[in-house]
Amino acid sequence: MTYLLNSPDDFADEAVRGLVAANPDLLTEVPGGVVRSTETPKGQPALVIGGGSGHYPAFAGWVGPGMGHGAPCGNIFSSPSASEVYSVVRNAENGGGVILGFGNYAGDVLHFGLAAEKLRHEGIDVRIVTVSDDIASNSPENHRDRRGVAGDLPVFKIAGAAIEAGADLDEAERVAWKANDATRSFGLAFEGCTLPGATEPLFHVEKGWMGVGLGIHGEPGVRDNRLGTAAEVADMLFDEVTAEEPPRGENGYDGRVAVILNGLGTVKYEELFVVYGRIAERLAQQGFTVVRPEVGEFVTSLDMAGVSLTMVFLDDELERLWTAPVETPAYRRGAMPAVDRTPRTTTWDAAETTIPEASEGSRECARNIVAVLETFQQVCADNEAELGRIDAVAGDGDHGQGMSFGSRGAAQAARDAVDRNAGARTTLLLAGQAWADAAGGTSGALWGAALTSAGGVFSDTDGADEQAAVDAICAGIDAILRLGGAQPGDKTMVDAAVPFRDALVKAFDTQAGPAITSAARVAREAAEKTADITARRGRARVLGEKSVGTPDPGALSFAMLMKALGEHLTR
């Protein structure tokens, strides 16, 4: 568990602030994350790497010469929001375009993708590289659909070295994908991790057993095995990873490997060295040539007791870049050649939002929106622990926390907007952005998009009637479908949202409140029925069979909020 904290809500932000304070020669804090504290050459591509917090030294610990130019930092185990990614890129990019590098998770794909679209509209060349090294999460044929784990380190290290050596954007992107496709990882755990402020881990592993094939967000493994000796654990890791070794003698590969034995949080270095001793024996027995092995903590999962093995199958190019010098707060190797140490003098910051003039009718509607969002905030707070418990069965256990953070951020943004005399449209637009920023993750992106799209139905110059309220809800659900890409039967929020929308349209006559209340009952029934479905999307997809018997937390939270909305409007 986390022993030292001030507030669970502020833990991630305070950790970043302390990291920057400890490394002022390398890092500068900007809205949404960190960038290098020194100037970078004009026209050099920027490598912006990121993801949720809780994985230190990934990702902010890898910003510096020879590696990353910036890192957006999400909340614990939640992807940074699109606006956070956008802010970090605007501060890091210096005329050479940008590579966005992140692990292949649904929330990161959504938020980084939305930021990339906005940046491209502004004329910045953006490339996306999703790390997908975890062999437990998909088949070899679907390698790029796998999730990213400790392979983040070599992929970003190699891409950063290529940029440092003078690669342009096309070349850096090519090298990053090449490194990703040459990287394989496999992990296991002996106990789950505990979120800051929580008293119980997200999952337990029975004494004498280990969870095999786990992720890095507190997800349980794909199966449980008996815990053997250190040598037996080493053999399992080695056999799983080397099963996907490419043929020697093809494409420049001849048995050279970069090897990373990664502790996930509480496995001590001495234990790791015992395991690595056996791995080194196996490598020698099978004729591998080991290039700059690493043993330590590189991509962690808070205090998870676990270990993972990563191998990068090297050719001449990848070996040269893997062994190149690097200087970051958490990862240093060799002596960097002369680099510009000129302190960064300018930073980009978003201008304050201008509030359009609004009519009294629209401002009255905005005040009602605030009341609804405050109701949402209370419902999410009351159900945070239960939603987290349900999510931990096959996911990372952060859904309750994300919904609580998001609804609180949206309610505060709406109050601030109303205090500035905003109308209904502007209030919902700002609330949607705030929900996405505060929550991060997939649910943050989807609820943020839903509120933003709902706001598009309203006007700042006119009031709103009951029909507009129904139209706004339907627009929000359509945005969830469009952005998330899920369909009914995938075991997501959509399984409750689509039946709700259809029932709402059918039940609505002249009063929105009763129709929403009636449709919310349909949504709840649909959410409960997701317990019978095997998850096909999101982090729970990897543990699909484990999700059977437990309803989808996103579908449940949607039904809860629609019930609260109906009750509020019926009063």
Swiss-Prot record:
SMART domains: Dak2
Enzyme nomenclature, EC number: 2.7.1.209
PROSITE patterns per record: DHAK (PS51481), DHAL (PS51480)
Catalytic residues, chain numbering: H217 (tele-hemiaminal-histidine intermediate)
The reaction(s) this protein catalyses: L-erythrulose + ATP = L-erythrulose 1-phosphate + ADP + H(+)
InterPro entries named in the record: DhaK_dom, DhaL_dom, DhaL_dom_sf, Dihydroxyacetone_Kinase
Domain of life from the UniProt record: Bacteria
Disruption phenotype: Cells lacking this gene are totally unable to grow on L-threitol.
Keyword Transport: no
GO molecular function: ATP binding; carbohydrate binding; carbohydrate kinase activity; glycerone kinase activity
Induction: Slightly up-regulated during growth on L-threitol relative to growth on glycerol.
Domain DhaK positions: 7-331
Functional pathway: Carbohydrate metabolism; L-threitol degradation
Positions of the DhaL domain: 367-567
GO biological process: carbohydrate catabolic process; carbohydrate utilization; cellular response to carbohydrate stimulus; glycerol catabolic process
Record: residues binding ATP: D396, G397, D398, H399, G400, Q401, G402, T442, S443, G484, R539, D552, P553, G554
GO cellular component, one term: cytosol
Position of the signal peptide: none
Ranges annotated as spanning the membrane: none
Function recorded in the entry: Kinase that has a preference for L-erythrulose, producing L-erythrulose-1P. Involved in the degradation pathway of L-threitol, that allows M.smegmatis to grow on this compound as the sole carbon source. Is also able to phosphorylate D-erythrulose and dihydroxyacetone in vitro.
Name under which the protein is recorded: L-erythrulose 1-kinase
Organism: Mycolicibacterium smegmatis (strain ATCC 700084 / mc(2)155) (Mycobacterium smegmatis)
GN (gene name): lerK
